[in-house]
Amino acid sequence: MDVIILSFKFDGTVCSDLHIIKDFVEDVLDKLNKVIKDESVMFDVKLILNELVANGAIHGNSYDRNKYVNIFINVEDDFIRIEVTDEGNGFKCDLKSYDPLNLKCSGRGLVIVSGLSDEFYVEKNKITSVKYL
């Protein structure tokens, strides 16, 4: 089954307001739906994108509407690359220390994104997820 019709690139920025982010991400997903036809891949991409953009606004930018989250997406024949950068100071990511039995209110998002990604990188305030198609 062909997953991709054509290659696709997106580069956009959104302020750290979760209501605005919701509409912004929906618009990006509508554009991706025209390129990626596999529903299970789109489900993963939707979850990855929602988690990363929300994390950037909440944890990186502390909900500051004057700070922005940048999203870069590149879709090619065999992969989709999602890069999300916020204006925060960055953090050290240690997914191995996550304990699913510790019922914290945060911390699961990056574990989920890492699990859905074939490649996952954190560099200060930039997170990259690569999913092979």
Q: Residue locations for each model-derived region?
A:
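Bergerat-fold GHKL ATPase/HATPase_c domain
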Residues: M1-L47
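Flexible, glycine-/charge-rich segments associated with ATP-binding catalytic modules
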Residues: M1-S16, G115-L133
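Conserved ATP-binding N-box helix of the HATPase_c
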Residues: S40-D64
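A conserved short beta-strand within the histidine kinase catalytic ATPase domain
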Residues: N66-N74
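Short beta-strand-loop-beta element adjacent to the nucleotide/active-site pocket used for signaling
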Residues: V75-I82
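Glycine-rich/acidic phosphate-handling loop/turn and adjacent ATP-lid/helix
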Residues: I82-S106
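Glycine-rich phosphate-binding loop
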Residues: K104-S117
